[in-house]
C-alpha cells in the first residue's frame, strides 16, 4: 500500500497532461480513430461493453461494438454514443462473421475476446469467428488486442499467425 501511495503522489497534473496527445482544435470524432470491439455473449455481457466504453474514455473518436442482440441492447442503454453492429448467435454466442471484413478494414484497432465464450467453453462456430478476425487483422495490418476468451482460444492453437501489432 505504501508503494501505491508513493506512486500516486508522483502523478501530477502536468505528468498526465504530457502523456496524452493534445486534441486538435478543429478535430472531430473521425479524427481520433475507430476501435472495433468484437465480443460478448448471453453470459458475459459486461466485458465487451466496458472495453468499448474504455476505448472512448481513452481517446478513440468512434467505437463499434460487434456482438449479439442481447449485448447490444444492454450497451445501448449504458453507452448510447457507441456504434452497434449486430452479429448472429447460436446458444447465446457469436457464430457469424457477417461483413466483419469491412468493419475491420476501416478500424484503427480491434479488441477481440471480451466475454465471447459460452457458459463453460468457447463454441466451435465462435472459434471459427475468432480465427477469421485474427486472419483479417493480419491481412489488413490492423492492431489487435486479445482479451479473455481470445487468449483462451489462442492457447489452444499451435500454428496461428498473429498480426504484427498484437497485444
Residue ranges of model-derived segments:
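Short N-terminal helix-initiation segments at or just after the protein's N-terminus
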Residues: 24-26, 53, 106-107
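Glycine-rich phosphate/dinucleotide-binding loop and adjoining beta-alpha-beta core of small-molecule
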Residues: 4-5, 11-13, 66-167
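YjeF_N-associated NAD(P)HX repair module
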Residues: 1-38, 42, 153
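Residue-level detector of functional hotspots within protein domains
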Residues: 16, 21-23, 49-51, 70, ...
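Substrate-binding N-lobe of the ribokinase-like
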Residues: 28-92
Amino acid at each position: 500500500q505504501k508503494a501505491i501511495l508513493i506512486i500516486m503522489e508522483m502523478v501530477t497534473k502536468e505528468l498526465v497532461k504530457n502523456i496524452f496527445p493534445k486534441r486538435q482544435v478543429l478535430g472531430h470524432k473521425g479524427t481520433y480513430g475507430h476501435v472495433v470491439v468484437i465480443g460478448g455473449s448471453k453470459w458475459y455481457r459486461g466485458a465487451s461493453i466496458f472495453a468499448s466504453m474504455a476505448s472512448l474514455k481513452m481517446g478513440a473518436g468512434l467505437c463499434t461494438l460487434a456482438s449479439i442482440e442481447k449485448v447490444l441492447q444492454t450497451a445501448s442503454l449504458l453507452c448510447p454514443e457507441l456504434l452497434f453492429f449486430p452479429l448472429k448467435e447460436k446458444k447465446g454466442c457469436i457464430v457469424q462473421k457477417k461483413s466483419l471484413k469491412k468493419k475491420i478494414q476501416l478500424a484503427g484497432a480491434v479488441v477481440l475476446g471480451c466475454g465471447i465464450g459460452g457458459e463453460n467453453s468457447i463454441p466451435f462456430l465462435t472459434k471459427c469467428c475468432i480465427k477469421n478476425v485474427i486472419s483479417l487483422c493480419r491481412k489488413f495490418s490492423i492492431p489487435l488486442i486479445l482479451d479473455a476468451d481470445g487468449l483462451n482460444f489462442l492457447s489452444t492453437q499451435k500454428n496461428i499467425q498473429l498480426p504484427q501489432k498484437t497485444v
